[in-house]
Amino acid sequence: PAAPEPAPAADSVPGLHVQTYCIRAVPCFWMADTVGKLLDAVGNDVRPDDRTLLRVLGAIQPTAAACAGVEGEVTAAPAAVAQAFIRWLTGLAARQPLAVHIRRAGEMDDVSRGVLEYLLAERPAGLTLLTEDGGALGDMPSGK
């Protein structure tokens, strides 16, 4: 039998790359990890119109609240957090190619999985979602 095609090299995708991790037992962990890693990568180079989204994302990632100039604990409804994550991620990807490498994707928490499935269905321009072996992420099992 023929050998399987090798996965595309991670560096074959241009733009910003972040390595993210999943922990099933922690709600929103993948989203929080992604936000934190992206903020580490872009530094304080945050657009003023992103600050509102980052303020909401502060409910799951304290670094986002700090970037938005918010002090203290932030609370937000889960739907607001999911929408802010989707809008911020797609906005970043529209401005520069963005590759999110997902490690332990099978261990993703349910909230993040729902958001990931939304992103996979919408396929926003500039956003590439990759598994830990560097392959592009297709439909993931729902874990149900």
Task: Report residues per predicted region.
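Key residue(s) within conserved catalytic/signature motifs
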Residues: P1-K144
